Amino acid sequence: MEPKEATGKENMVTKKKNLAFLRSRLYMLERRKTDTVVESSVSGDHSGTLRRSQSDRTEYNQKLQEKMTPQGECSVAETLTPEEEHHMKRMMAKREKIIKELIQTEKDYLNDLELCVREVVQPLRNKKTDRLDVDSLFSNIESVHQISAKLLSLLEEATTDVEPAMQVIGEVFLQIKGPLEDIYKIYCYHHDEAHSILESYEKEEELKEHLSHCIQSLKKIYMQEGKPNLLDMGSLMIKPIQRVMKYPLLLCELRNSTPPSHPDYRALDDAFAAVKDINVNINELKRRKDLVLKYKKNDEDESLKDKLSKLNIHSISKKSKRVTNHLKILTRGESQVKDNTFNREEKLFRALEKTVRLCVKNISLCLQHIQDAMPLALQSVMDLQEISYNKDDEMDYSETLSNALNSCHDFASHLQRLILTPLSALLSLFPGPHKLIQKRYDKLLDCNSYLQRSTGEESDLAKKEYEALNAQLVEELQAFNQAARKILLNCLCSFITLLRDLMLVAQQAYSTLVPMPLLVSSISEIQNQVLEEIQNLNCVKENSATFIERKLSFEKKKPVQILPEMPHQTDIHRSKLLSTYSAEELYQAKRKCNATQEYDINLLEGDLVAVIEQKDPLGSTSRWLVDTGNVKGYVYSSFLKPYNPAKMQKVDAENRFCDDDFENISLFVSSRPASDSVTGTSESSIGDSSSSLSGTCGKFETNGTDVDSFQEVDEQIFYAVHAFQARSDHELSLQEYQRVHILRFCDLSGNKEWWLAEAQGQKGYVPANYLGKMTYA
């Protein structure tokens, strides 16, 4: 027996070596390129499948036998004992019966699917009842029918006109396992929902009557064909689930009935593992769905009794462990399992939620503002039309205005329908995934807790629940984020399009009202002309010199225009003035005066000038037209004093107190800080356009006490040279000679022409050249 056993083992090794060579060249792969194919004449709905002709099958069978018989059957015949040969024959006979059962049951199953589609699904769809959702009831039953027809076709092709010893069934299932799993996953995933929908339909008489009519017609066909009687619609809907669960049983039995030396044994082993994995994956998918439905249930749906029933020692212990593990993770005392894919999708999910919420809020506010502003804008247009109304113009703009108002209403309705409604519906879908994400984190904490303590059933259960919930979230969050992003982008594009259309309507209406659009330069010229006309009015002439336009804090400071430098006054110029003008017309500059406006001139302290006119073109008496003997221009009168050489010394002695005390009081102080402007020399006097106040000594009473107190005054104390009326809440009104305390020598933008002052408890901005520094000798 030992030589025979050794020979048998060698033959087994030889067969295993040849199996890899033969498997890829069996009934499907070894075909000639010139094989003739004909349509199957088998009756049934799968008649469109392609089959080999009889001559090609015979030739293919002969070639397969030539390859396997010399190396297989001869060797087996030499080594097998009569008992083993008898056992193998029994196994082959049983194998043949199982293959026939597999094919026959697949035919019956396919026939049931055909009847279901023809007698139930199609008639219900043709009724087009709104309350009857056929797709939700039967899911992808047509796809199940197609994959069953394909499987049956491949099984028949692998067995027809092929010797039982040469039939390979495992390769058929390996070839079709991918589509088989995808299709049955969808059907099994929706079966529970379909069953619930069926129960709800059976409660409505009209829908129940439609379903009963289809079932009765189907029962008649079953009775005519001699099949077992169909119980109800539920038993018909569960057939695909029963069938996919039966494939592993049939393949397992077929593998056990196949000799190990048979070329189909290894393929059957792989096919059995494949269909078993299909069932495991389907069950896992269903379990994941059940977990999602369990944790997705809103707390509002639970009664107080249900919530109290969950409160027990186990739940309290579990929650306390979660808190402990969470604190450990926060303090980095314990590592956490990370899923980068989930973290990325969760981050995108939260960003999308925030974006959608802000879009709903901001677009709603935008719509509200547009609706509020449109009537006001139309009223302004009508007022401007009335102002610019020309009697010769007989055009009627009422139609244009009504069209603009209608466009606003259309904009609001389209915005609500195309943007706000979809975004609001999308926003309402975020709480469900939020709750599942939180549950997923809880399950992760449970999993970490059990893994640290034990590896028992509780640990395995916690790990399975976490992995199931995590896999479900990763899969569905990707689909949800992709769909949410697409909806969001479409809504934003629609919003931009609606705004563009509204602006185009407004532009067309404007072009109708104003045929020729004005250029920016033309608008500036018109504005300047209007301002000049306003300044010529008597009511504004007096205040035109003190009119100062305050610059806002966010505006950039305009560059100061550099005026051309003028030559200094010489003795020749003085002689010319003395010989040309009378003594009453001659004045002398009390201090240096710099030009601040157009047509102003610069003066040095002691320069002699002749006053030509004691007002400027706008009628202001604060600026005089003077002649220096070299040039003519405007100078502020406060910088000048009468010229009288005979009384100069006497006037200086009499006015020593007044002039010395107020010589350094600047009417138009510089924008420089006080620290730079405390000297009394002409070169360092305060401001580029400073002046002293003459003839005001009598308005100030001085004694020893007052002088001492004034000397103790902070250097930040100034007084108002001119009265200033505030034009906004940010400015401070001042009376003439009113004392003010300077808080800051510039505004928020750094503009030193406006100072922040405080007077009588009020704060505000004041023009710098309206203030004078209070200094005393």
From Swiss-Prot:
Residues 582-645, 713-776 form the SH3 domain. It holds the Pfam family SH3_2. The keyword Transcription does not apply. The modification Phosphothreonine is found at T34. Residues 35-72, 673-694 are annotated as: Disordered. GO terms for cellular component: cytoplasm. Changing K67N: In a breast cancer sample; somatic mutation. Residues 679-694 have a biased composition (Low complexity). Residues 327-536 form the BAR domain. Keywords: Guanine-nucleotide releasing factor, Phosphoprotein, Repeat, SH3 domain. One of its GO terms (molecular function) is guanyl-nucleotide exchange factor activity. SMART domains: BAR (SM00721), RhoGEF (SM00325), SH3 (SM00326). Residues 94-285 form the DH domain. CDD domains: BAR_DNMBP, RhoGEF, SH3_DNMBP_C2. Residues 37-52 have a biased composition (Polar residues). Residues 53-66 have a biased composition (Basic and acidic residues). May act as a guanine-nucleotide releasing factor. This is Rho guanine nucleotide exchange factor 38. The gene is ARHGEF38.
